[in-house]
Amino acid sequence: MENNVKKETIVDSEKVEKQQLVTAPVVNKKENTEPKAKTFKRETTTSNFEERVVKIKRISKTTKGGRMMRFSALVVIGDKNGTVGFGMGKSIEVPDAIKKAIKNANNNLIKVKQTKKGSIYHDVNGRHGAAKVMLLPAPEGTGIIAGGPVRAVVELAGFTDIYTKSRGANAPMNVIRATINGLLQQLTPKEIARLRDKSLREI
């Protein structure tokens, strides 16, 4: 009899455990209701401008902690269709300095005049500081007679036939400014006729 009682109690206890397992409330894991962070994609813009690095210079700055070495980059950009610009950037790395210079150049874009044949309308003289640049029109097929910073400006501006001559100081920044100042002095035949109160045929 005792054995039967023990078996019954064991069976009853097993039934109770099964019932508890079945009737036990299912605890759901807390769902993450916080809004997910949005992922932003960096927009990539295609630029029609070409870049030309004119000069890279290493500069140092003396501080209490010692000398700090950095690089400066001078860049000229243009679309070869009359738009040109220049800029300078500084950073501890050369690529970063070039990127800053390009960004600065995009903020300093100017539009220059040119003939249909890719030359200038007349002789001009540009000056900035002690730098002087003379620009002369050239016949078709001559090419770009220029060097250094002057060539970078006129080539990226879209000129194909032009004579140039640089005099005075040869600091790249001043030469670039002098070249652009000269290009901005151009007058088209219509503008000259208007200033002289004459028709295009009379000029």
UniProtKB/Swiss-Prot annotation:
One of its GO terms (molecular function) is structural constituent of ribosome. Residues 49-112 form the S5 DRBM domain. Keywords: Ribonucleoprotein, Ribosomal protein, RNA-binding, rRNA-binding. The keyword Ribosomal protein applies. One of its GO terms (biological process) is translation. PROSITE patterns: RIBOSOMAL_S5 (PS00585), S5_DSRBD (PS50881). GO terms for cellular component: small ribosomal subunit. SUPFAM superfamilies: dsRNA-binding domain-like (SSF54768), Ribosomal protein S5 domain 2-like (SSF54211). The keyword Transferase does not apply. Part of the 30S ribosomal subunit. Contacts proteins S4 and S8. The N-terminal domain interacts with the head of the 30S subunit; the C-terminal domain interacts with the body and contacts protein S4. The interaction surface between S4 and S5 is involved in control of translational fidelity. NCBIfam families: rpsE_bact (TIGR01021). With S4 and S12 plays an important role in translational accuracy. Located at the back of the 30S subunit body where it stabilizes the conformation of the head with respect to the body. HAMAP family: Ribosomal_uS5_B (MF_01307_B). This is Small ribosomal subunit protein uS5. It comes from Ureaplasma parvum serovar 3 (strain ATCC 700970). The lineage of its organism: Bacteria, Bacillati, Mycoplasmatota, Mycoplasmoidales, Mycoplasmoidaceae. The gene is rpsE.
